[in-house]
UniProtKB/Swiss-Prot annotation:
Polar residues bias (residue ranges): 26-42
Protein name, per record: Polynucleotide 5'-hydroxyl-kinase GRC3
InterPro entries for this protein: Clp1/Grc3, CLP1_P, P-loop_NTPase
Expression induction or repression: Cell cycle-regulated with a peak of transcription at the G1/S boundary.
BP-aspect Gene Ontology terms: cleavage in ITS2 between 5.8S rRNA and LSU-rRNA of tricistronic rRNA transcript (SSU-rRNA, 5.8S rRNA, LSU-rRNA); rRNA processing; termination of RNA polymerase I transcription
Acetylation found in the keyword field: no
ATP-binding found in the keyword field: yes
Taxonomic placement: Eukaryota, Fungi, Dikarya, Ascomycota, Saccharomycotina
Protein source organism: Saccharomyces cerevisiae (strain ATCC 204508 / S288c) (Baker's yeast)
Reported function: Polynucleotide 5'-kinase involved in rRNA processing. Required for the efficient termination by RNA polymerase I and the processing of the IST2 pre-rRNA internal transcribed spacer localized between the 5.8S and 25S rRNAs. May act by maintaining the phosphorylated status of the downstream RNT1 cleavage product, which in turn allows the torpedo activity of RAT1 to efficiently terminate Pol I transcription. In vitro, displays polynucleotide kinase activity on both single- and double-stranded RNA and on single-stranded DNA alone, but not double-stranded DNA alone.
Source taxon at top rank: Eukaryota
Amino acid sequence: MVIDSKQDLPQYTKDSGSESDSDSSNNFIVESPSIPSSKSATVVLNSEEYEDDEGDDLNGLDAELIDNITYEGDEDETMFVGLKEKQKLHLSGVFRLQVVKGGIVYNNVHYNASREILTFWHPLSQSIPTIDFSHFAGWQDTFFMPRNNRFKIRDEEFKSFPCVLRVFNSNHTGLLEAGHLYRDVNYLWKPKEPYFPLNERTTYHLLHESDRIQSLSVPGYWSTPLEKLYLSHKNAAYDTRIMVIGGKNSGKSTFLRLLLEKFTQDIRDSTTSQEELVYLDLDPGQPEYSLPDSISLNKILSSPISLGQHLCQGSNFQTLLQFYAGSSSPQDEPTSYLNCADKLIDHLEEQAFFGTSLLNLPGWIKGFGMQILNHIIRKYKPTHLLFLETANSKRHLDELTIPQSFSTSLRDAYAPEVVRVPAHSLNHTLSSRFHASQLRTFKILALFHKITQFDYDFAPLLKSAPLQISYGKGKSGIKGIQFPMEFQDLNPQDIKSALEGTVIGIYTYSGEDSLEVKSLNTFPILQSCTSSSKNFITLGLIHSIDTSQQIMNIYVPPCHTQILDKQPEDAQWIIVRNKTETPFCDFLPSPRTITWDDNIQIPFATFERRKKLEHVWKVRKNVMRRGQFMKR
């Protein structure tokens, strides 16, 4: 969607304290491009060609975009968009973008025209950030047109546009096909009935006001704390520790994402390589970088440039340490959760880290959740503590206990800077479209169907063969099975059914002492095992168990098989059964997603509909109703 903005960029929503966006962020008008302002800066335009290994009709685009868009329709579904002053663009999906001429502003960060390729992730479960027009920030504007595109497009076509963008398909193949297996996310990346229909191969979509999308509007009262935190990151002599606290749907993840995008762009522009950025992802229910139901410590990479909400599918981070929490909320096993969080923070301390770290927490701020927050504050020792307040959460946040000063191995006593900012719910109109449980299922499916870093195959797992792993005494495979505390007294006859069709955590044991296990119906049940002696590897999905041969059939994410292969041959394997939800669409796929061999006879099952007058006769028990008495 190309629209004309009524305000100069960057644009903020002036919110009066409510959690809704202003009208200007929800009402989009698609208009023909206006004539550039006479006050626009005069720039000298150089033309620079370069080779591009990525691979003029409009294909039915609306007439109101003809002057702005040139659609090539090549193998990458390339589209060139020209923007004039005060115009902006809305796109959904996963796509790559190059600023060919001028510049753009995205989430209040400026990006100049260059050869750099930006990868954008815009799911419709989130508010869609706008790609705003901007001029080239420099002395001499340059036209970075790939040579293979220059043969098809004349310079005169975009001469009147101060900003030109090249939008083309993502290099992630198969990701948008998750809806074929899990229908709830069929329209996660694209509108159900797009106003501007493009080729089916496109991984992005132009958005229109009729698509009922919500624009990401950054409120004005967020701009000041964002700018202050950026200056603290840029000018800090020691490490900077930023912690954001708030209730559910208060905008914690969005606020941290805005900070990250600003910090990473600053690191790319910096002449030194000493600045580092790490992210403590402690929200197992809605993680930004962790595996499903896990918490982790991650190093953020400045390249490749990944913008937006990637739903844990991005490649701009490196996981330093990760623990499987086993559920979407810390309230299920708070002690285990805190132990894992402490180990992540201890690992950060051991690195003598001088850069900037950010910490994301779940929105549990009531009852025992407040004790968890107080514990992590004392452990993490933030330099900056930001509260995102609402009318309901303000009284809970007043119960926080914040020490007056902290001290670490890198610096002596320092006082944390505490800032209270009104929360801003950015996705309130979209809450009925995608629920958190649906997004969690999508992330689990994406994990088990991820072939390589960029390739996905959402064919049902039943069409592929699982790994066969032995278990039990005298076997070289799984040495121990761990259940949650409330299932320690599980009936031995129920262990098999409690494991089949469930998601498990796969660990290796590194303790010096031998594992303390108890054999129950051939299953080696762990009696005690400290978390410090377990190394989390990945998640698995148990297909079935053969108790006679003591073999488990387990699906492992294809992208993680190399991690398993790197483990030593004498590694002692442990699996942990917890409360992660199973994606049943993999085990019970719809008939249209899987075809059976005609030679396979499945008893008592049919995928054919009965004829109109065909009925199934069922024998009913005589319950001695009045009409069922036999006459004599």
